């Protein structure tokens, strides 16, 4: 895998801090990707060209981030045969709820997989799982990644909890301090 398999696109370069965790996880898994800015509103022709041509260049999955009206993921999905994963970006007024609803409420026939507001890491992981259909080594790496997640230690245990605080956890999770 050397040619980009995932296209990470955003409506503005100010979206990069939101998108960057997707790039980091793709890099961690060794998945080649490209990054670009294409706006559904400011550069619609460029956006449509990107969406229509991505598959001819070997891109397998497109991850699109947008805030506000967040038309980018849906418009790209309408113009490409590839799977599209939308990342809603939080802006100051509605904290990303407008973006989430805009991306998630697609008409029948124009699917966009949507992650949580600002959920770029999950978008990257979903892209990797999607690629796993074709690249079995990614399935193996994902299984290792999930196994390593079992080593996660909740941050609440070091804190002092009141003895009255109910803890709903199986005994295998450890004991309360």
Curated annotation (Swiss-Prot):
One MF term in GO for this entry? 5-(carboxyamino)imidazole ribonucleotide mutase activity
In what pathway does it function?
A: Purine metabolism; IMP biosynthesis via de novo pathway; 5-amino-1-(5-phospho-D-ribosyl)imidazole-4-carboxylate from 5-amino-1-(5-phospho-D-ribosyl)imidazole (N5-CAIR route): step 2/2
Mind telling me which InterPro entries this protein's record contains? PurE_ClassI, PurE_dom, PurE_prokaryotes
* The EC number(s) this enzyme carries: 5.4.99.18
List, alphabetically, the Gene3D superfamilies matched: 3.40.50.1970
**Residues involved in substrate binding:** 12, 15, 42
Q: List this protein's GO terms for biological process.
A: 'de novo' IMP biosynthetic process
Q: Which UniProt keywords apply?
A: Isomerase, Purine biosynthesis
Q: Which reaction does it catalyse?
A: 5-carboxyamino-1-(5-phospho-D-ribosyl)imidazole + H(+) = 5-amino-1-(5-phospho-D-ribosyl)imidazole-4-carboxylate
Query: Is Membrane one of the keywords?
Result: no
Q: What does this protein do?
A: Catalyzes the conversion of N5-carboxyaminoimidazole ribonucleotide (N5-CAIR) to 4-carboxy-5-aminoimidazole ribonucleotide (CAIR).
Q: Which family does it belong to?
A: Belongs to the AIR carboxylase family. Class I subfamily.
**By what name is this protein known?**
N5-carboxyaminoimidazole ribonucleotide mutase
Q: Which organism is it from?
A: Corynebacterium ammoniagenes (Brevibacterium ammoniagenes)
């Amino acid at each position: 895998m050397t040619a980009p398999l995932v296209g990470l696109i955003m409506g503005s370069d100010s979206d990069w801090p939101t998108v960057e965790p997707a790039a980091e996880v793709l890099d961690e898994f060794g998945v080649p990707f490209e990054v670009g800015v294409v706006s559904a509103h400011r550069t619609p022709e460029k956006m449509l060209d990107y969406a229509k041509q991505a598959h001819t260049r070997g891109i397998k999955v497109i991850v699109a981030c947008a805030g506000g009206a967040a038309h980018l993921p849906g418009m790209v999905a309408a113009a490409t045969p590839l799977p599209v994963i939308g990342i809603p970006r939080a802006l100051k007024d509605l904290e990303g709820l407008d973006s989430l609803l805009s991306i998630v409420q697609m008409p029948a026939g124009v699917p966009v997989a949507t992650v949580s507001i600002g959920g770029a890491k999950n978008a990257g992981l979903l892209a990797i799982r999607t690629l796993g259909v074709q690249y079995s080594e990614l399935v193996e790496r994902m299984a290792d990644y999930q196994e390593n997640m079992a080593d996660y230690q909740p941050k609440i245990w070091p804190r002092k909890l009141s003895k009255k605080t109910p803890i709903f956890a199986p005994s295998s999770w450890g004991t309360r301090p």
